[in-house]
Amino acid sequence: SSIGNDGVLTSAQLFSSSSSTVVPTPPVVTSPVVPVVPVAPVVPVVATPPVVTPPVTPVGSGAGAGNGTGYAEALQKSFLFYEANRSGDLDGATNRVPWRGDSGMRDGRDGVYFGDRNAANLQLGLSLDLTGGYYDAGDHGKFGMPLASTISSLAWGGIAFKEGYNATGQLDELLAAVKWGTDYLLKAHGTDAAGNTSFFVAQVGDVAADHALWSAPESQTIARPAMAVTAQKPGSDVTAGSAAALASASILFRENGSIAYADELLRHAESLYRFADTYRGKYSDSITEVQGYYNSWSGYKDELSYGAAWLARAKEAAGGDGTAYRQKALQLYNTDIGGLSNGWTQNWDDSSYGAAVLLAEDTGNAKIRSDVEGWLNSWVNGTNGVQITAGGLRFISQWGSLRYAANTAMLAGVYADSVTDPNGAYSQLATHTIDYILGDNPRNSSYEVGYGINSPQQPHHRAASGVGWDGFRNGLPNVNILYGALVGGPSQANDFAYTDVRSDYIGNEVAIDYNSGFTGALAFAAQRRAGF
């Protein structure tokens, strides 16, 4: 289905159930969590919930709203996915996903560890309120790295493509999605009386225990410990990345009238960044458990540059001077990052591409512009490790291939709008990628759940599946429709290398970082279609 020219979803739609290569070299796999599937099925924990389609906020009609391609509907539904992955206390009056309820309500009270989860690191007597935030994927861990990347990407899209959000009537949904994440980041940030960072929680949940279950989070009773980085157990990547998330969000909220909240976010962002820069180290060396899920392959210099670039903008948006932060970002980029690997892209682990685009926008630096354009040209032309399928998908990695394409699409849109768009190549890359994801591909199938034709029926997602291990491989559609979720997509540079099966966590899992660039790119496409 697609959205009509008046920009309003019909009730039938709403309630149907139906050039040069430089270091660092990217890792082969930067994967979301690998689920542990027992050989023998176990008894499901939860009863099968009813099939209920959540209502979608109608898109306002009028000037600029008539994009006949369905970008608005796809954007609406993307926010429903974020709501389906919320943890914490869900307000019954505003919860649009009726098969989701309160969960993770003991987060922060099942033990807080500074560093690895062992007896020596347990902080006796420390109890925190870590409710809220987002589950990272189709399971129930809460991880700082993908959350930080997700929030900064969503905020960036709201800043860069505000007219797209206005045209589709989704600005309020964007602000709500970002705030659900930033409220949690504020809880995860431990400070002293002077506002200096003392610790930052980088993971909540016993992920191995969670992976042994196939059940909705509402029914789970396993312990959910919290692991934090400190000065002695540093995590510059996760803290600088979270500073970037808070700084970018502060700009978004300031632009939309929430001045006091924006000021609070900026204060926390600056404190986290000072901590990240002073106590340097990879968080995955301090909390080794995350190495199996979200290892810091790229190190922390990329997040330090990215965080400083966002802080420069945030300080200026608040009426201050961002010069020192911008010089810091430039120094880190030029000296420590050195350039961009053209066959890779922005993702939860590698923020160097985002840093480069921000600095190219804000400084016009010729070398950085050359880096960005060399990278984007590789994606346009299919060179330097970027493969192009017969249907036009740019492919670099089997695990969540569409996430990488969508992330590049969003940054291509940002760069096209703000710096240069040679012969329209970058904006065409962005819109073509989104059109491919939404169904303009050789499979004639949408990769966004609940949107368009032949969309995924069995995304790898515990709560949406509505079954336990006994039904895990039943081949039936999920009981609950996970509206708006972007699945991983083709696992090879082949348009048909995709199977809609629940057990395929490489091609059919979903994740909050998968949808982040996708959401921004949708807003870009909607903005272009609306004439802005």
Language-model features: locations:
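Long, low-complexity, Gly/Thr
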Residues: 1-65
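Aromatic (Trp/Tyr) and acidic
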Residues: 59-153, 157, 202-241, 245, ...
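Long, compositionally biased, intrinsically disordered segments
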Residues: 77, 81, 168-169, 184
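A non-catalytic, amphipathic alpha-helix used as a structural packing/dimerization or gating element
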Residues: 77, 180, 264, 268-271, ...
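Short coil/linker segments at helix-helix boundaries
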Residues: 156-180, 222-230, 248-266
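Carboxylate/His-rich catalytic cores and anion/metal-binding grooves
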Residues: 177-195
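Hydrophobic, small-residue-rich alpha-helical packing segments that form membrane-like cores
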Residues: 270-274, 281
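Acidic, Ser/Thr-rich low-complexity linear motifs
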Residues: 285-296, 342-346, 388-398
